[in-house]
Curated annotation (Swiss-Prot):
It comes from the Bacteria. Anthranilate 2 binds at residue 167. The lineage of its organism: Bacteria, Pseudomonadati, Pseudomonadota, Gammaproteobacteria, Pasteurellales. Its cofactor is Mg(2+). This is Anthranilate phosphoribosyltransferase. Belongs to the anthranilate phosphoribosyltransferase family.
Length: 334
């Protein structure tokens, strides 16, 4: 396969096969593609619209070149958002991962520093005293013993650094933004995946299906890359190779509505303070409900289908400080 041929195809508005896309992105990750070539390719893909085969090929390239994580044989999930919704809310999926782990569900959360919001998952975890840059073996130990680990994307996908200069100059969403949530190095086959726009719900759902996930749920919540407490959440549930599309309201979870303003966050220290209060059993009502609906949905990927019952379990837990203990335990893994 020739790099020049692939670039020519892209510039002639032709879609790549999965194998061609994988080859191209392996070259990118290995540092064999110039900034000019990469910029041209990413723009060509974006303007035409990336196909499922092209995204899946890029995912396979990322996995083929990633630092290995010793994947467990037990059931575990990931909870992640694409980011880029522009709303600067508190880190709901990070808090939900800690809560789910406290309830006994194993979560290997993949994430990175903030790209578009003030505070990404690793930013808030660092502010909470967690070392996000632990080795794969230590992370696996944390997952085994404490039901929770955080996999810091730059440690596992070091080759993505070759795309950083181009991404910074382009300042627009590219295929790399699509990739982030799909390349968990633990190869999670259960996932709650929040997306920044209703337009990309279907492409994510179909890509997740092509990656043979066991039970994953893609959501967009009225402007948020989360299940929302202020409006309708659009859902694509992928199970046994089938996709079911439906929508949910806060009432379907048995909670009252809250304004999006009630979920606003800020710098890492501010978000860390709010999450600490929540985990200690002193959370604000809107924060409790936002984490409850997202954790409830994550529990569903483990077969816990009753969303109202799931929410109640979370709310009962968040009236105690047990989830804070999980966070403190996680801080011991250095």
């Amino acid at each position: 396969m020739q790099l020049d041929n692939i670039l020519s195809q892209l510039f002639e508005n032709q879609a790549l096969t999965k194998a061609e896309s994988q080859y191209f992105f392996e070259q990118v990750i290995q540092g064999n593609v110039s900034n000019e070539q990469l910029a041209g390719a990413l723009i060509a893909l974006k303007v035409r619209g990336e196909t499922i085969e092209e995204i899946a090929g890029a995912v396979e390239a990322a996995f083929a070149n990633a630092t290995a994580f010793p994947a467990p044989d037990y059931a575990f999930a990931d909870i992640v958002g694409t980011g880029g919704d522009g709303q600067n809310t508190i880190n709901i999926s990070t808090a939900s991962a800690i809560v789910a782990a406290t309830l006994g569900y194993k979560v290997a959360k993949h994430g990175s520093r903030s790209v578009s919001s003030k505070t990404g998952a690793s930013d808030v975890l660092s502010a909470l005293g967690i070392n996000v840059a632990i080795s794969p073996q230590t992370a696996r130990q944390a997952l085994d013993e404490n039901n929770l680990c955080f996999l810091f994307a730059p440690l596992y996908h070091a080759g993505f650094k070759h795309a950083v200069p181009v991404r910074q100059v382009l300042k627009t969403r590219t295929l790399f933004n699509i990739l982030g949530p799909l390349v968990n190095p633990a190869h999670a086959k259960r996932q709650l995946l929040g997306v920044y726009s209703p337009e990309v719900l279907k492409i994510y759902a179909e890509t997740v299906r092509s990656l043979n996930h066991q039970h994953s749920i893609v959501v967009h919540g009225a402007g948020l890359d989360e299940v929302t407490v202020h409006g309708e959440t659009l859902v694509a549930e992928i199970e046994h190779g089938e996709i079911h599309y439906f929508s949910l309201t806060p009432e379907d979870f048995g909670i009252q509505r809250h304004s999006i303003e009630a979920l606003k966050g800020g710098e890492p220290a501010e978000n860390a303070e709010k999450i600490t209060a929540l985990l200690q059993g002193k959370g604000e009502a809107a924060h409790i409900d936002a984490v409850a609906v997202n954790t409830a949905m994550l529990m569903r990927t483990f077969g816990e289908r009753d969303l109202k019952a799931n929410v109640q379990r979370v709310k009962d837990l968040l009236s105690t400080d047990k989830a804070y203990q999980t966070l403190q335990n996680l801080a011991q893994y250095q």
